[in-house]
Curated annotation (Swiss-Prot):
Belongs to the UPF0102 family. Pfam families: UPF0102. This is UPF0102 protein FP2501. It comes from Flavobacterium psychrophilum (strain ATCC 49511 / DSM 21280 / CIP 103535 / JIP02/86). PANTHER family: UPF0102 PROTEIN YRAN. One of its GO terms (molecular function) is nucleic acid binding. It comes from the Bacteria.
């Protein structure tokens, strides 16, 4: 596995642990539909939380959350629609970004709730 894939997996694992500690139930990880992949699908109370994880070894070239582009958002929305229909869910949906980045010798996590709107 390429080093950047290892880093991405590390960031996703940290994010799952982070969310669980905050009381989220993890429903799926790396859920795919067509060309879209949702990193984490979680639930907290009556909210379905769709989480895009962005991991960077440094923030020299920009914050991780800045790398979630409109095309990615469109793919996520299509995938979420399919997930909700397939699982017959009636929940509020929220899109979050978790940024994982290295600062000095340790990794930091930032959680951006309601990071973007799909309507």
């Amino acid at each position: 596995m390429a080093e950047h894939n290892d880093l991405g997996k590390f960031g996703e694992d940290l994010s799952v642990e982070f969310l669980q500690k905050k009381g989220y139930s993890i429903l799926e990880t790396n859920w795919t539909f067509q060309k879209a992949e949702i990193d984490i699908i979680a639930q907290k109370e009556n909210i379905l939380v769709i989480v895009e994880v962005k991991t960077r070894s440094s923030i020299d070239f920009g914050s991780p959350q800045d790398f979630v582009k409109p095309a990615k958002i469109q793919l996520l929305v299509k995938a979420v629609n399919e997930y909700v229909i397939s699982n017959d869910l009636d929940l509020e949906i929220r899109f979050d970004i978790i940024a994982v980045y290295k600062e000095r010798k340790e990794f930091k996590i930032e959680h951006f709730e309601d990071a973007f709107y799909h309507f």
